[in-house]
Regions:
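N-terminal intrinsically disordered/low-complexity leader segments
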Residues: 1-13, 24, 143-144
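Helix-turn-helix
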Residues: 14-17, 21-59, 63
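Generic hydrophobic alpha-helical segments
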Residues: 22, 89, 102-106
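Amphipathic alpha-helical interaction elements
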Residues: 52, 91-94, 107, 111
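The DNA-recognition helices of helix-turn-helix-type DNA-binding domains
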Residues: 57, 64-68, 126
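Hydrophobic alpha-helical connector segments
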Residues: 63, 70-100, 150-151
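Amphipathic alpha-helical packing segments from all-alpha helical-bundle domains
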Residues: 73-74, 94-103, 113-142
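Short, intrinsically disordered, charge-balanced linker/junction segments flanking boundaries
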Residues: 142-151
């Protein structure tokens, strides 16, 4: 028997605040510290409000990851459009805070399939961006991809 439970608006300021606080907690204390009760207390809302916006903690974690992943992909696309330099892309994606974020989500993905699937989808999109940039650079230089060994 399914219920028609209400879910909060995805563009709500309260929802965005919960995502911000959850991300801070994740980076400061690790993913295990992010529970609906602790998140509610830190965000100064009830745990029920957390579940009003996110049916499950998996849904919350996916949204935290997705938000940063989308920002990352956007920054990478902009860097490639500006100068086409892969160095600028790699500099963008190799900051310590980003590394900590990715490590927490990698650890979380060991226990939650939804997170694992989201990371895989992001990885594929990021790979496609890099592939397109490398292929374009090869074309500019008149290099055939077949001329270079993969290693």
């Amino acid at each position: 028997m399914s219920t028609n439970r209400r879910i909060g608006a995805t563009d709500s300021k309260s929802r965005a605040h919960l995502l911000d606080v959850a991300e801070r907690m994740l980076l400061e204390e690790g993913y295990a510290a992010v529970t609906s009760r602790k998140l509610g207390a830190r965000a100064e809302v009830s745990p029920q409000l957390v579940h009003y916006y996110f049916r499950t903690m998996d849904e919350l974690f996916v949204e935290v990851f997705r938000r940063r992943a989308e920002e990352s992909l956007q920054r990478v696309a902009e860097a490639l459009a500006e100068d086409g330099s892969l160095v600028s892309v790699w500099e963008l994606t190799s900051n310590p805070l980003g590394a900590r974020f990715n490590l927490e989500f990698a650890a979380l993905a060991n226990h939650r399939k939804a997170i694992s699937a989201e990371i895989a989808a992001y990885g594929e999109r990021f790979r496609q961006l890099q592939h397109a940039a490398i292929a374009a650079r090869f074309d500019e230089l008149g290099i055939s991809a077949e001329e270079l060994p993969p290693t």
